[in-house]
Design a protein with these regions (language model features):
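Structured interface patches
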Residues: 1-183
Length: 183
């Protein structure tokens, strides 16, 4: 759904959209398991910068809900995430702040996104919000043992017979010092 600046100049735009799995590209590792439900409102916020300059920001306030499958960072088993997120975002026209050699940015301004042209695509905003809702590293369980670095077996399922420790000869001098200290 494209949120057009022209429509926002007339009235706020309410949205209630359902995006099936695969409609919004969430990347290779994230798989959408259920429809993404989104609803909210887009408004035009006019900001007066100086006597004759008006900046038309777009404010999108809403919520989304979906179910995602992400591989565990240690063992690669699929992990299900239920995502429910509210958002209140402000988008400013790209290039509107140009002309200044150096800008000081307040904490509030750090939260501002930018749009080009006549509006913005709701799907881009939703993609960003879904990905921000996920943890940086997904782990299937706290005690996940991961994959064997030698044979690739899932150590949560089987115990492999690989040698646990391969000695790196570059560490031998430090090992000798440690052995002397332990005596």
């Amino acid at each position: 759904m494209f949120i057009e600046l022209e429509d926002l100049r007339i009235h706020p735009v309410d949205f209630r959209e359902v995006f099936g799995p695969g409609v919004i590209d969430l990347g290779e590792e994230v798989r959408q398991r259920s429809p993404l439900l989104s609803e909210g409102r887009a408004d035009l916020v006019e900001e007066h910068h100086g006597k004759h300059k008006v900046v038309e920001d777009i404010r999108i306030k809403g919520k989304l809900e979906t179910s995602l499958e992400v591989p565990c960072a240690r063992c690669l088993d699929p992990v299900i995430h239920q995502v429910e997120r509210s958002f209140d975002l402000l988008y400013r026209p790209l290039g509107n702040d140009s002309g200044h050699e150096e800008l000081s940015v307040t904490d509030a301004e750090a939260e501002i996104g930018y749009y080009e042209g006549d509006g913005l695509l709701l799907e881009d905003t939703l993609r960003e919000q879904v990905l921000l809702a996920l943890p940086l590293k997904t782990i299937c369980r706290e005690d996940c043992r991961g994959l064997c670095p030698h044979c690739g077996r899932n150590l949560n399922e089987v115990q492999c017979s690989c040698v646990d420790e391969l000695e790196d000869p570059r560490w031998s001098a430090l090992k000798e010092i440690r052995d002397k200290l332990n005596q």
